[in-house]
């Protein structure tokens, strides 16, 4: 299903009067499972992230991940909570290809999207102009982390899962507040 259709379906479920909605685990530790989660807890997670990152009404945010998983759903919930201007792209390995000159305040990507984006000069420039980038959904290898350290914007690695309604930890990857992690 194209992402715009997924988005409309998610918004319909979000605005439904039920205090719950269904999400699907990624299956990274076994068979993917469906589970019901409370919308108010999703809003609380969105509030914590938006407040911590200083996101506010009108900031441009990028949705470039599938809405069948919690990461994509939480980008929408953060946008609803904070009044972000959500830009929607079909999930792909190159989310900033043919993007144009619209600067982004906030984006969330998986490591492969970041890796691919950094390989294409025009896409790399757009990524470096994105004020805040969070990277989740998988480990960031040492070579990619080293490349990210050189980026001028604010980049975090996230740790979380469906059961925690997105990330529960952020680790700064670059800038003076960067936190090194050795394996």
Name the predicted role of every residue range.
Residues 20-47, 54:
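Conserved AMP-binding A3 loop
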Residues 120-175:
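Gly/Ser/Thr-rich phosphate-binding loop
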Residues 1-13, 122, 133:
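ANL superfamily adenylate-forming
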Residues 6-24, 57-60:
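Conserved pre-ATP/AMP-binding loop-to-beta segment of ANL
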Residues 1-5, 33-36, 85-91:
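Short beta-strand->loop structural element characteristic of the AMP-binding/adenylate-forming
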Residues 25, 182-183:
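Conserved small/polar residues in nucleotide/adenosyl-binding loops
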């Amino acid at each position: 299903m194209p992402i715009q259709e997924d988005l409309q379906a998610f918004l319909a479920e979000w605005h439904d009067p039920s205090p719950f909605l269904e999400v699907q685990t990624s299956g990274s530790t076994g068979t993917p499972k469906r589970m019901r989660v409370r919308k108010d807890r999703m809003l609380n997670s969105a509030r914590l992230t938006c407040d911590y990152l200083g996101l506010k009404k009108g900031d441009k945010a990028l949705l470039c991940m599938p809405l069948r998983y919690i990461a994509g759903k939480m980008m929408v919930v953060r946008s609803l909570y904070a009044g972000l201007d959500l830009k929607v792209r079909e999930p792909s390995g190159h989310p900033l290809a043919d993007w144009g000159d619209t600067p982004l305040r906030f984006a969330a990507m998986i490591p492969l999207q970041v890796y691919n984006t950094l390989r294409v000069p025009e896409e790399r420039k757009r990524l470096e102009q994105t004020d805040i980038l969070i990277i989740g959904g998988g480990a960031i290898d040492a070579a990619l982390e080293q490349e990210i350290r050189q980026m001028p914007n604010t980049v975090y690695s996230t740790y979380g899962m469906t059961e925690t309604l997105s990330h529960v930890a952020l680790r700064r990857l670059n800038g003076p507040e960067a936190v090194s992690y050795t394996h």
